[in-house]
Amino acid sequence: MKKFALLAGLFVFAPMTWAQDYNIKNGLPSETYITCAEANEMAKTDSAQVAEIVAVMGNASVASRDLKIEQSPELSAKVVEKLNQVCAKDPQMLLITAIDDTMRAIGKK
């Protein structure tokens, strides 16, 4: 099974820059439609952009589900490891779904 390495330092809670100017009448942001495989390819050339996308989606999942995430030095590695597992099962899964599954697995209500 191919491992998706979305970068060990990928999950850093970043500001929500691409979500700030969102207007539903303009449709969903294009980042919403990125698959795990596409994010993996994109990370090879623009890891900062992928890190930001993952952080924004992760924050949205945590906030909308009111999850409690215990901050620790291992958090980034734990999130990336779980995200890689989820993406490896279905590389064509939307990244936002994979991140939501990951955050629900790590977080607590």
UniProtKB/Swiss-Prot annotation:
UniProt KW keywords: Signal
Superkingdom, taxonomy of origin: Bacteria
GO cellular component: outer membrane-bounded periplasmic space
InterPro entries the UniProt entry points to: YmgD, YmgD_sf
The keyword Ribosomal protein is assigned to this record: no
Signal peptide region: 1-19
Stated name of the protein: Uncharacterized protein YmgD
Organism: Escherichia coli (strain K12)
Taxonomic lineage: Bacteria, Pseudomonadati, Pseudomonadota, Gammaproteobacteria, Enterobacterales
